[in-house]
């Protein structure tokens, strides 16, 4: 039996409102699936899922605003949830679709929940990984969880997070992938270098 040929991953850009988003896409099925990455990641986080899902669907994995090759608006106000949701709506328009299945992880899952709550008509299916429904997260919040979520507040500070992350050749980024992975060794040295390269992409 011959192995199935690997599907091609194609790169492109979509102008959505005031920003330009880089994305990769795979497959050509009728149903659109949008994959939203977490923090501090980019489309590469979905590299294993893209060719598998692409056998049945048209799969799109954007670099969300502020990440890798997408535009990086300078103000904190440029990253409010309304604008992040609008970016996903812009992707739907770019691909000429009125609905999509959304698969999202971490920070991207927060955006996906907001999209589904505010625009349920555009979400055919939703798979949110690692982030519960916002109301459930709020109602079950504990001090221990709040302490573990320190980074969400830290990375909203001006300038300090950039200095912290870039010190010693982005050693902190290295640690984030090596020490927080559920499965030790899940990220190869090559993977981590690719993630570091994405972090240093200019604005």
Q: Language-model features: where?
A:
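Flexible "cap/lid" subdomain of the alpha/beta-hydrolase fold that forms the substrate-access gate
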Residues: 1-12, 18-21, 26, 32, ...
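Structural cue for short, hydrophobic secondary-structure segments
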Residues: 35-38, 61
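The serine-hydrolase catalytic nucleophile loop
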Residues: 39-50
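Alpha-helical segments within the soluble intracellular
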Residues: 53-54, 93
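Active-site machinery of serine-nucleophile hydrolases
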Residues: 54-63
């Amino acid at each position: 039996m011959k192995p199935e040929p690997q599907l091609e991953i194609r790169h492109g850009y979509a102008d959505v409102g005031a920003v330009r988003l880089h994305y990769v896409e795979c497959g050509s099925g009728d149903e659109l699936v949008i994959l939203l990455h977490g923090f501090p990641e980019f489309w590469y986080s979905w590299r294993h899922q893209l060719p598998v899902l692409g056998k049945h669907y048209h799969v799109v994995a954007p670099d969300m605003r502020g990440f890798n090759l997408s535009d990086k608006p300078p103000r904190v106000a440029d990253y409010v949830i309304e604008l992040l949701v609008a970016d996903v709506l812009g992707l739907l328009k770019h691909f000429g679709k009125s609905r999509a299945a959304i698969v999202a992880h971490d920070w991207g899952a927060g955006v996906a929940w907001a999209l589904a709550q505010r625009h349920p008509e555009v979400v055919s299916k939703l798979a949110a990984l690692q982030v519960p429904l916002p109301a459930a997260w709020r109602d079950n919040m504990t001090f221990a969880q709040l302490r573990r979520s320190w980074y969400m507040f830290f990375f909203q500070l001006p300038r300090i997070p950039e200095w912290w992350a870039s010190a010693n050749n982005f050693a902190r980024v290295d640690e984030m992938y090596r020490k927080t992975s559920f499965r030790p060794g899940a990220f190869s040295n090559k993977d981590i270098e690719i993630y570091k390269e994405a972090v240093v992409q200019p604005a």
